[in-house]
From Swiss-Prot:
Ranges of the Cytoplasmic topological domain: 1-6
Gene Ontology cellular component terms for the protein in this record: Golgi membrane
GO MF, one example: sialyltransferase activity
Encoding gene (name): STLP2
Protein name (database record): Sialyltransferase-like protein 2
Known role: Does not possess sialyltransferase-like activity in vitro.
Record bears the keyword Cytoplasm: no
Glycan attachment residues as annotated in the record: 72, 260, 304
Family label: Belongs to the glycosyltransferase 29 family.
Gene3D superfamilies referenced in this protein's UniProt entry, alphabetically: Glycosyl transferase family 29
Residues in the signal sequence: none
Localization of this protein: Golgi apparatus membrane
Length: 396
């Protein structure tokens, strides 16, 4: 007896019905996708996020410098002529030619008070301990983890939260603004890189709660004033005003030690070195917005960004990191002196007009605009679980 076979068309129809039935049963078992799972998708362009999260050559260079100082640096001090002060030398071995043996090369030179510092060996041990902490923090960061988690810890660094905060940039747009009283009315006022307020009070105010600087500012203070002024004279807003500093060059950690050693009760030099996680978070946000702006302006692939910016030196500005810190400690944040206008000086307190090439200010302005209008669109801050961007107002 011959078997009866179904026509091919009927076989395909039967398979389609069975497949549809199975898919419906699977959907019933799984349920619809939850809004909570979809909300966990990272904010921003995935490719730009991945590229921005790469620390790049600049971070590797700083780590290499710190490791070299930790392993090979030497410190020696000598009395000056007349023994009025001491000359301090930070040196590293350096081969001046491929065949020549390494010889000591001076990395930093400071004039310091005769009796304010510990012996050379103890000072070197303290410097190596500071370098060791610096390296350990960045290596922990490099092994992964959520750098945005620092946003939950920032209030503890300053000891409390603040209701209203003003971050005062140094742009020349402040001149003639009359914003001084409005700035001083905030609970916390953050100023940048020890910018002068004397003579500009009507436009920039006089109140300062925190001075935020890059370590180049501290290095300049130490080189000029370590011998003559307590705490290197690096607190123009008063000896009690704390300073938050991010490290541009690991050798500058020695300046911090020197200035701490010359502190007095009236100038106690309260210095906070920024958390490595905060440094990484700011670097990623700055690079993301710079990448996005590059792609939008040029139409080129994001991979070509390095043709416009040298990764070894590209860096966020002091102002941007101060803004991110304020987001973590303040219920409301106001930004003054960020931006530019035709004819305005780069800094209100200097004659500088040209911007520094290592910063992408336009990209940072895009970031501030998103903080004010679209805070949920800011990448990487969404990784800070339990953190909400506070209201931000950018005063033009």
């Amino acid at each position: 007896m011959k078997r009866r076979h179904l026509p091919p068309v009927l076989v395909l129809l039967l398979l389609s019905i069975l497949s549809l039935s199975f898919r419906r049963r699977l959907l019933v078992l799984q349920g619809p996708p939850s809004s909570s799972s979809s909300s966990r998708h990272p904010v921003g362009d995935p490719l730009l996020r991945r590229l921005a999260a790469d620390d790049g050559a600049g971070s590797s260079q700083i780590l290499a410098e710190a490791a070299a100082l930790f392993a090979n640096a030497s410190i020696s001090t000598f009395p000056s002529l007349g023994n009025h002060h001491r000359l301090l030398y930070l040196r590293m071995p350096y081969a001046f030619s491929p065949r020549a043996p390494p010889r000591p090369k001076t990395v930093a030179r400071l004039r310091v008070p005769v009796d304010a510092l510990p012996p050379d060996g103890k000072l070197l041990a303290s410097f190596r301990a500071s370098l060791g902490s610096f390296l350990a923090a960045r290596r922990r960061r490099g092994r992964g983890g959520n750098v945005a988690g620092v946003m939950r810890d920032l209030a503890g660094v300053l000891g409390r939260r603040y209701r209203t905060c003003a971050v005062v940039g140094n742009s020349g747009v402040l001149l003639g603004s009359g914003r001084g009283p409005q700035i001083d009315a905030h609970d916390l006022v953050i100023r940048l890189n020890n910018a002068r307020v004397a003579g500009f009070a009507a436009d920039v105010g006089v109140k300062t709660s925190l001075s935020f600087v890059n370590s180049n500012i501290l290095h300049i203070c130490a080189a000029r004033n370590a011998i003559t002024r307590a705490a290197c004279g690096c607190h123009p807003y008063g000896g009690e005003v704390p300073m938050a500093m991010y490290v541009c060059q690991p050798a500058h950690l020695l300046d911090a030690l020197i200035c701490n050693a010359t502190a007095t009760p009236s100038s106690p030099f309260p210095l906070l070195v920024t958390d490595a996680r905060l440094d990484a978070l700011c670097a990623r946000i700055a690079k993301y917005y710079s990448l996005r702006r590059f792609v939008s302006a040029t139409g080129e692939p994001a991979a070509n960004w390095t043709r416009r910016h040298d990764e070894r030196y590209f860096h966020y500005s002091s102002g941007m990191q101060a803004v991110v810190m304020a987001l973590g400690v303040c219920d409301e944040v106001s930004l003054f002196g960020f931006g530019k206008s035709p004819g305005a000086k780069h800094h209100y307190h200097t004659n500088q007009k040209k911007e520094l090439d290592l910063h992408d200010y336009e990209a940072e302005y895009d970031f501030y605009g998103d903080l004010q209008a679209r805070p949920a669109a800011v990448p990487f801050l969404d990784d800070a679980h339990g953190f909400t961007v506070p209201p931000v107002r950018l005063h033009r």
